[in-house]
């Protein structure tokens, strides 16, 4: 088993242990490498599935004003459990939540209501309000505005610089959208990929986020929000970094972020957080301008270089390139890989490379390691196979109908792609040891019967399988459909959609063969 596979399983077990009861401590490594303990409050978990806009449990407006005090008391109880040492900071964060709830339910906030909420801290109201106003500005993108000086009435107004949140307002509330924009901008400043540790370091350095407790006070379980919720919504991708021990992870822009957010918007957002202008990073500024122009041209042409299918296709192309140079074991420069992928894919190249690296590791026993991070030079390393894996591969021999046809048939019946787990549920009927599944898949992929695509929105990463080029060359869909019909004791016509596709496939092949014969024998 590869190092990544072992660490991924270990990581999954740790996460389960840490969040099993919704409370506990997580260890986030900061930039210096030392662990930082962060207390975690209860947070709803996002389901592991292709997600619609309901995936993340965003803040909801309180419908019944009578419930407001209950919610505030619950929030205060949680804040008290965090043992924040500065009572004024405690109250300022609680006041932020109070003002947001009042704004959502009533549209305005009375100073008398805030004083009543603060109770014994009301004599410290000016300082608490100053801190709360700063938090609203820096995290939520909201200005606290006086709308009636005589009645001491306030409301919350969105800042002009936060238009980025408008397009994702249906999925995320303002603070989460702001956090996402900050992380996306940070990724942009780090060459379109950012280590997880650097994200935590950023959150701990940006103004009010100088204490881990405050991060979780405002966002709930922030680690789950970044590594699970934003991932399953496809705003972020979260991948292992190969060649690191212990295993590290990095964040990239997800396909939805590429589609809905411009690079200049993200750059402006993160520059505001650093009290800088976007052109303070001239290289990234120019790349953002060019990248947004390229994106506009591609949308006009009806192309999406960042779509999941396109990136997975390019990843499999890189896999085949890597396999072709395996015997030489020569270093590969990133420019060579990018040239093979296509210059137009430069912005999403890290996404493509991570997919290819994961496929190589899981199914080919190869590790693509960046041996020179400054020059971006990679080396393809053969992983030593355990004796058990060697026996499994040798025992499989040449793929037979016993394995190939059921897998190809299931893929065809499931819409020409199927999750790997579903394949092994089928093969249990053939008394196939599920423990051998990666060995079987590895064998079939090496022989080009199958292609593998990681599902970037899943954490831990799942895979789907498709027909490979050899399968398309050696068999036809009708033959596979007839095999599955015999297996299930049905007729091919019992799957009308697949039957129609198989007939069209036969007709297309016959037409192609006729055309070839015409040119070979024009007489």
From Swiss-Prot:
Protein name in the entry: Melanoma-associated antigen E2
Keyword Repeat on entry: yes
Native species: Homo sapiens
GO process annotations (BP): negative regulation of transcription by RNA polymerase II
Entry keyword annotation includes Repeat: yes
Gene Ontology CC annotations of this record: nucleus
Disulphide-bonded residues: none
Coiled-coil spans in chain: none
InterPro entries noted in UniProt: MAGE (IPR037445), MAGE_WH1 (IPR041898), MAGE_WH2 (IPR041899), MHD_dom (IPR002190)
Domain MAGE: 88-288, 311-502
Keyword line: Repeat, Tumor antigen
Superkingdom of the organism of origin: Eukaryota
Stretches that traverse the bilayer: none
């Amino acid at each position: 088993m590869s190092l990544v596979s072992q660490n991924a399983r270990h990581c999954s077990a740790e996460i389960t242990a840490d969040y099993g009861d919704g409370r506990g401590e997580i260890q986030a490594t900061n930039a210096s490498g030392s662990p930082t303990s962060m207390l975690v409050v209860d947070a709803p978990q996002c389901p592991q599935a292709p997600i619609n806009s309901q995936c993340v449990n965003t803040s909801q407006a309180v419908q019944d004003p009578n419930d407001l005090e209950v919610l505030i008391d619950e929030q205060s109880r949680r804040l008290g459990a965090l043992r924040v040492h500065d009572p004024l900071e405690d109250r300022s964060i609680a006041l932020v939540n109070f003002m947001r709830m009042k704004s959502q339910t009533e549209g305005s906030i009375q100073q008398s209501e805030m004083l009543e909420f603060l109770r014994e801290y009301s004599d410290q109201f000016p300082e608490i309000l100053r801190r709360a106003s700063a938090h609203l500005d820096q995290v939520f993108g909201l200005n606290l505005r006086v709308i009636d000086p005589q009645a001491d009435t306030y409301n919350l107004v969105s800042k002009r610089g936060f238009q980025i949140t408008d397009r994702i307002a249906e999925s995320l509330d303002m603070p989460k959208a702001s956090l996402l924009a900050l992380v996306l901008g940070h990724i942009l400043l780090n060459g379109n990929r950012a280590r997880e540790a650097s994200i935590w370091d950023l959150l701990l350095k940006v103004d009010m986020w100088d204490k881990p407790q405050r991060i979780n006070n405002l966002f709930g379980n922030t680690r789950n929000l970044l590594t699970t919720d934003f991932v399953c919504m496809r705003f972020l991708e979260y991948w292992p970094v190969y060649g690191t021990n212990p295993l590290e992870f990095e964040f990239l822009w997800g396909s939805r972020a590429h589609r809905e957010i411009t690079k200049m918007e993200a750059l402006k957002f993160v520059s505001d957080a650093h009290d800088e202008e976007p052109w303070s990073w001239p290289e990234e500024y120019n790349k953002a301008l060019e990248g947004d122009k390229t994106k506009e041209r591609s949308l006009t042409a009806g192309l999406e270089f960042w779509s999941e299918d396109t990136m997975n296709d390019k990843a499999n192309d890189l896999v085949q390139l890597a396999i072709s140079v395996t015997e030489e074991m020569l270093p590969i420069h990133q420019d060579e890989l990018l040239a093979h992928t296509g210059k137009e894919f430069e912005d999403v190249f890290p996404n493509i490379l991570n997919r290819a690296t994961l496929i190589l590791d899981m199914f080919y026993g190869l590790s693509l390691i960046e041996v020179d991070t400054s020059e971006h030079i990679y080396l393809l390393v053969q992983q030593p196979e355990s004796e058990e894996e060697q026996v499994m591969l040798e025992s499989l021999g040449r793929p037979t109908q016993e394995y190939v046809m059921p897998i190809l048939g299931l893929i065809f019946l499931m819409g020409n792609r199927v999750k790997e787990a579903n394949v092994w549920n089928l093969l249990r009927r053939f008394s196939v040891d599920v423990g051998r599944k990666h060995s079987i898949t590895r064998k079939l992929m090496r022989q080009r019967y199958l292609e593998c695509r990681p599902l970037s929105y899943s954490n831990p990463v799942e895979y789907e399988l498709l027909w490979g080029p050899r399968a398309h060359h050696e068999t036809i869909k009708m033959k596979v459909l007839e095999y599955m019909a015999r297996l299930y004791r049905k007729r091919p016509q019992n799957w009308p959609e697949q039957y129609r596709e198989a007939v069209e496939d036969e007709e297309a092949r016959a037409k192609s063969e006729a055309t070839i014969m015409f040119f070979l024998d024009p007489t």
